[in-house]
Each structure stands twice: as C-alpha cells, then as structure tokens.
C-alpha cells in the first residue's frame, strides 16, 4: 500500500487542470473484543483507508467545487479520481458562498506512517475480562458488551501548500449486565485513549452495586414528578438532541424544533433554568 503522504503528493501532481485541489486520506485501524452471555464471541483487527479528492475550478470570480471519496486507492486509480472530482465540480457550478482557501500551512509529522493499533492494546484488559466472565457465570450474572480501540490518522494536502496531519487514538468499553432471571439489568461504560485507565474491577463493582440497588423496588403511581438526572444521562440526552437538531428537519416540520405553522423554534426560550451546553 502506498504511504498516505506519498499518495497525496502523486494525486496533487496529476491535478494540473485544477485551480486548487485538496486531498484527504484517513488510515484507520481498530482492535475489538465482543462477548455475550458471559462468553467471548469475537475478536479481531480491522484496517481501512478512505481517500477524498476535492476539486476547485475558478469561474467568473467564484469557485466551483466537487469531490469524490474512494477506498483502497492505488497509483492506477489516480487519474480516474481526479477526473471524477473535476466532473463533480463542473456539474456543481460556481458557489455563491465561496471563500478563499487557506494556503501554506503545515502541522504534524507529515512523512510519518500510520501507527496501527492491534490486539496488544488489550494485554492487561483481556485477562482481567476473562476472570470477570468466569466469576459472573458462578454468580449467575449475564454479561454482554464489547471493547474497542481505534487509531485514525488523517492527512490533508493541497496544491496551495497545506500539509496537515492529525492522529486520534480512542477507545471504549461498554458492558451490560443482567441478573435474577433478567429481572434486573444495568450498564457501565468507560472512555479511553490507550486502555491504561480501564479498570475491570471498577466496572465490576459499579455493575454489582447497581444490580443490588434494584432489589429495592418502590411502586410510584402514574403522574408528573420532579426528577434529578445524573450527569451521564444529561450527556446522553444532549447527544441525542444534537442528532435531531438539523435545521432542515426543523424548517420542514419534521422535528421537535419545528414551530407550529412553519419555521423553526430558534430564539425560543426552552427552560426557566439557566443552562449552557457545549459541544
């Protein structure tokens, strides 16, 4: 496989008919473990590459732009990529909101290769997970979940001198537990960059504590009640709010942010409580 930065340079060298060309390559590897009914089910490593070519053509003081994205690109695909991006730009026509494109900016280790993640990231976690699964069977607790670690490296290069690189390692563990003939259930999750902060014993303690809490049941009549949300649930609700806050969906009357009679609820006061949300 051609190194990402070399492939970008080759594509840019072929984009002689374009006023500007931006190439973005993302190399990503992921290692994962999955389990169900307290038994490890699958594990493996996934590797992928995405190549995006953006073509820019000057037209009447404005700029037309178009792009294409492909996977597993090699040298023989370069001309087709450039031609397809060029055709997309011509079909799109000049953009009214065109702004000058940044030039001559470098960031990150441009020539360095992607450093793939692999199953060794679980060298401490996996044995501890195995012990937990054995204990859960003895205690009649069913565990379901997965652990994954992803390392994505993104390169962006342009004819105008942009040479940018970003490395983003991230991972997570998510585990669901069921007990007492599945009459009780709970969930625990951990975010991580390298699994050094993941403690299986802490996950186990949190799960058992929440399952034990569910032994105490209080019947509450139907009605309206004041509720205090823990911070984790607020984050989950906010994430979903972001997913459904598309301006177009709101304008077309397809979401909770749509105003009765048409338009959106932008500017409307949603709560009497002062609250700042950041993404």
Task: Outline where the language-model segments fall.
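N-terminal short leaders/motifs
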Residues: 1-19, 119-136, 241-268
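Acidic low-complexity segments
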Residues: 4-8, 18-31, 76-166, 197-235
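N-terminal basic/disordered segments at the start of proteins
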Residues: 1-41, 45-54
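Short, ordered loop/turn segments at secondary-structure junctions
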Residues: 28, 68-73, 180, 232
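Active-site-adjacent "lid" and substrate-binding segments of diverse enzymatic cores
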Residues: 147-279
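A generic structural motif
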Residues: 26, 54-58, 176-180
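N-terminal alpha-helical targeting/anchoring segments
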Residues: 31-90
């Amino acid at each position: 496989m051609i190194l990402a930065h070399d492939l970008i340079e080759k594509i840019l060298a072929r984009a002689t008919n374009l006023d500007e060309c931006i190439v973005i390559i993302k190399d990503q590897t992921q290692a994962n473990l999955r389990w169900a009914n307290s038994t490890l089910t699958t594990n493996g490593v996934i590797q992928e590459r995405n190549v995006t070519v953006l073509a820019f053509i000057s037209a009447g003081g404005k700029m037309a732009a178009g792009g294409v994205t492909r996977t597993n690109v090699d040298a023989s695909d370069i001309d087709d990529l450039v031609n397809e991006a060029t055709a997309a730009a011509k079909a799109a026509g000049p953009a009214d909101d065109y702004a000058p494109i940044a030039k001559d900016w470098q960031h990150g280790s441009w020539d360095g290769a992607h450093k793939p993640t692999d199953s060794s990231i679980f060298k401490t976690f996996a044995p501890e997970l195995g012990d937990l699964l054995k204990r859960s069977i003895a205690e009649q607790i069913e565990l379901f979940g997965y652990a994954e670690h992803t390392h994505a490296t993104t390169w962006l290069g342009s004819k105008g001198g942009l040479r940018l690189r970003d490395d983003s390692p991230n991972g997570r563990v998510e585990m669901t537990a069921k007990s007492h003939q599945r009459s009780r259930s709970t969930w625990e999750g951990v975010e991580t960059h390298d699994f050094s902060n993941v403690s299986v014993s802490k996950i186990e303690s949190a799960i058992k504590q929440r399952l034990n809490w569910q032994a105490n049941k209080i019947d509450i009549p139907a009605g309206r009640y004041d509720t205090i949300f823990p911070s984790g649930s607020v984050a989950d609700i906010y994430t979903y709010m972001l997913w459904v806050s598309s301006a177009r969906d709101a304008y077309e009357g397809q979401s909770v942010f749509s105003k009765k009679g048409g338009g959106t609820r932008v500017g409307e006061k949603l709560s009497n409580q002062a609250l700042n949300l950041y993404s």
